[in-house]
Amino acid sequence: MTSQHGPRLAGPNRPAQEGTSMAMRALSAPADVLAQPILLPYPSELPDGLPARPRVLQLTDADAVSRGLADGTPRDRASNREVRACLELVQATTRTIDPRARIICAASSATATRHLDVMTASGGNTWLVRRGLDGADRALLEELDHLTDIHRMLHQPGRRRPAGPAELVILVAQDHIFARSIRRLRLLGVPTWLLVPGRSVARELFTAACAVTFIGPRPQPR
């Protein structure tokens, strides 16, 4: 499966990929998980060396949520209710791991306009709105690259050590554009737990993440 964002894998029941280790197999949330007040299970695929309560940076591509949760339906966008349920699920799961986690949602101006009610009612999140089709991607890449720079400093002798950088990234996305950044963070000892909003994910992004969970979309009534 291909798109403007590169080759994509359908999930969660896709064939095994050559070169993909068991540590990268996809976890699958129940199909109706967005309707349930439960948290996503903490994936065993994350490294054993993580602290029991790692500091978390949680990033959400709201464009991917808006379009991904509409996969398999005649709609091009998810409803406000579906988007809100997804964001609440991710936020609740993140806060369970790190109550002080930094949570950032990025959206293009078109997505922000479509889901303005969700944005204005969303508490505890920082919203970044950018123009253009890849505006949300660029905003999140800046956050990932900033975290990379901080961890590079930690590996340089004689440099002042920054206080409390994130030790785990929870990323809600589908596009391959994030693969390089999370691969670099992984080499610096910062794993990424990828949450996929929908049925497909770019192959490069899937293989770069340490753990993958598919969220929805919810089954449609017949």
Q: Across the structure, where does each feature detected by a protein language model lie?
A:
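Domain-level signal for Mg2+-assisted phosphodiester chemistry and nucleotide/NA-binding surfaces
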Residues: 2-14, 18-136, 145, 191
